[in-house]
Amino acid sequence: MIIYHLVPKRFYEQQIKNAVYLPKPFAHDGFIHCTKRADEMARVANQFYKQERGPHVYLYIDTRRVKAKIQYDDAARQYPHIYGGLNHDAIVAIRLAQRDPYGDFLPPEKLEIRD
């Protein structure tokens, strides 16, 4: 299954050299925030990151490849959390997050994963 994570492009590019990816809020939250659905990713992005300027990227994460524990902390199971660093080989695609003329994030494009 593919899950989604949004990150400022510049910050992600700085993380590539590290053994695992850790977003800025990880030190405080203890996990990496993700969403299960593309439309939900856009909703969350607009709720929390709309005011952030600069380019952002969507990370497409294959849950079968993630080495850290993944846990759903909500009853609806829409928000998977990765409890640990994200190994880079679990990121199967990176796409520039697009915005509409009003600055709202658009959902990430669907991605077909073949085994």
For each feature predicted by the language model, list its residue ranges.
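Conserved, structured core segments of small domains
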Residues: M1-D115
